[in-house]
């Protein structure tokens, strides 16, 4: 996608003055990432803000022992302003982001976006609206991890993946599923086996599970 076509997809584009549109155009870039590639984090520079033009990303935090906890998964048409604490200065934790599929992003650097926020009330409202939505997703994730049993979290994840893809089959390894629901690979493997014995899923070759019914 060319930059001109990408810029008009910004939710606040129509609220910018001509000079602001020119400024954004000069400071925005389109970046492509392959599946599994690091988008932000691990000591890299601040990404700024990003609009997902195609594909899907995964945002997560790392525990002290290196375990990944998935926070949210921005997909096509969605914006991400929590890609680093440098965007909203009062954020006291850093998120890491990887490309969950091949994806293309429209990226606006943090300094340029910060200038827009200070000068345009519509952009400022957009920033806090998206931040609020993301924090709601983070809180939902934390509630699941803290208060839902692993079998329920796993069942919900499998159902959501089937809804997302429109298929009754989930092609992921035990390790990948564990990362998504904040658990351990061994726990996921045992739970999937139990689901299969209960007739809820059918486990195929490595990395494939078919949902026979919703749990």
Functional labels for PLM-detected ranges:
Residues 94-95, 114-119, 137-146, 164-165:
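Short helix-to-loop capping/linker segments positioned immediately adjacent to catalytic or ligand/cofactor-binding
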Residues 72-129:
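Cyclic-nucleotide recognition modules
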Residues 150, 159-212:
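Phosphate-/nucleic-acid-contacting segments
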Residues 147, 151-155:
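Short, leucine-enriched amphipathic alpha-helices that occur as contiguous helical runs
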Residues 39-44:
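Short phosphate-coordinating micro-motif centered on Lys-Gly-acidic
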Residues 1-30, 34, 84-88:
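Cyclic nucleotide-binding regulatory module and flanking cytosolic helices
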Residues 36, 47-60, 75-77:
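Glycine- and acidic-residue-biased ligand/ion/polar-headgroup-sensing regions
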